[in-house]
Amino acid sequence: AYLIAVTDRITHLSKGDLGHSAISGTPVLDELVQHMPPTLTLLACGAGLALAVGLPLGLLFAFGAIRRIAAPFMQIATATPLFCAGLAFAYGAVQLLHWPVSVNMRVGLAVPPDQALRLAALPIATVGLAGAAAVQLALRRAAARSSGEAFRTGLKRLGLSGMEIEFLYVMPQIIAGLLASAGEIALALVSAAVVAEWVFNRQGAADLFVQSVALADWNMTAVILFAFACLTIVTGFFGRIAGYLLAREEMA
């Protein structure tokens, strides 16, 4: 009976039948296509905020004594549970700004532009700040690796100042290290999106993933997990290629 069930399942998979969602009863691929655009939009906006915040912080804390002073504080900040940060954002928005953060944003629901902006601001901030922590960590890690490079001594003997060495030779290596960490940053953004969509009741693919796990809907869970894994792997792959090409061009 087990072999028959496995054979039957493989036959359905070969035909593109991945099962049906336990939540809506629709095919899992249709459910994924319906819920993925809001999550991709959240990830894109969060990535933009992560770069806008993480790049200046990472570069500020990447050089000299500032890196050593800021290291323990940044470790504490990055270790803060994202769930707690999301709840803090929600509490501040309700108590201080009087924003409606608990409205259930259903797919296809039309809302006024100002309300849509308020509903989107907190999830984007949650995802963006989580991504910013990953960005600045990648920059500081790349700066720490480049701080012991042997070419610094040779360049100083050629008459270059420390500032020229940092910006002309070290900075490209740091940016290359950031690009090489694109997969880790994407993983941080996806993880933050799961928390943000669940805390702020946004019905995207990340929230659907949480619901599917709770209902033991493993067909839906596997498809969403595969989509997120592909997104992270592809981002990391192209990021590593870009980082390698940038570092190679600089060394040439």
Region locations from a protein language model:
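Flexible, active-site-adjacent loop/turn segments at secondary-structure boundaries
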Residues: 20, 97, 197-198
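A short secondary-structure junction motif
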Residues: 13-17, 96-100, 146, 189
